[in-house]
């Protein structure tokens, strides 16, 4: 999928719209992570993915052939630069929010794993037949951890 533009002005205008929409979606995702509601970010994933792919594709086309946009009006090109700067800022914000959520999630997983391990390692006694003290029964449960969240 590519932008079908009639001229440089049209292409730049469409790039502005694309960049602004992508910025808006990513900002909404960042807010969801910042407010500890990552499940709310899920509703934007599909559209964000499609638009990000289009953005990447169009950025590569423009880098490969600057002539696609260089004859556009200065005002439009400046607006595109401002939209791109805003997009970069929102990407940085989202990156920080996602990293913070990842750290919290990993911390919770490690805390739970440590608690499970300490519960299993704690000496416990049970009473068997005739009131005799038995060692802690062995449970077959296992837990697996890796470094990916």
Curated annotation (Swiss-Prot):
Localization of this protein: Bacterial flagellum basal body
Highest taxon of source: Bacteria
Main location: other
One Gene Ontology CC term in the entry: bacterial-type flagellum basal body
Keyword entries, A-Z: Bacterial flagellum
Self-association and partners: The basal body constitutes a major portion of the flagellar organelle and consists of five rings (E,L,P,S, and M) mounted on a central rod.
Protein name listed in UniProt: Flagellar basal-body protein FlbY
Gene designation: flbY
């Amino acid at each position: 999928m590519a932008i079908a533009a009639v001229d440089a002005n049209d292409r730049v205008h469409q790039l502005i719209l694309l960049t602004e929409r992508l910025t808006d979606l990513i900002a909404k995702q960042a807010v969801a992570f910042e407010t500890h509601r990552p499940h709310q970010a899920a509703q934007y994933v599909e559209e964000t993915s499609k638009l990000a792919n289009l953005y990447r594709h169009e950025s590569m086309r423009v880098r490969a052939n600057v002539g696609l946009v260089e004859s556009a009006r200065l005002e439009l090109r400046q607006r595109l630069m401002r939209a791109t700067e805003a997009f970069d800022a929102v990407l940085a914000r989202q990156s920080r929010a996602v990293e913070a959520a990842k750290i919290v999630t990993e911390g919770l997983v490690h805390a739970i794993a440590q608690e499970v391990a300490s519960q299993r390692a704690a000496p416990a006694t049970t009473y068997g037949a005739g009131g005799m003290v038995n060692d802690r029964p062995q449970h077959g449960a296992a837990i697996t951890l890796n470094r990916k969240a």
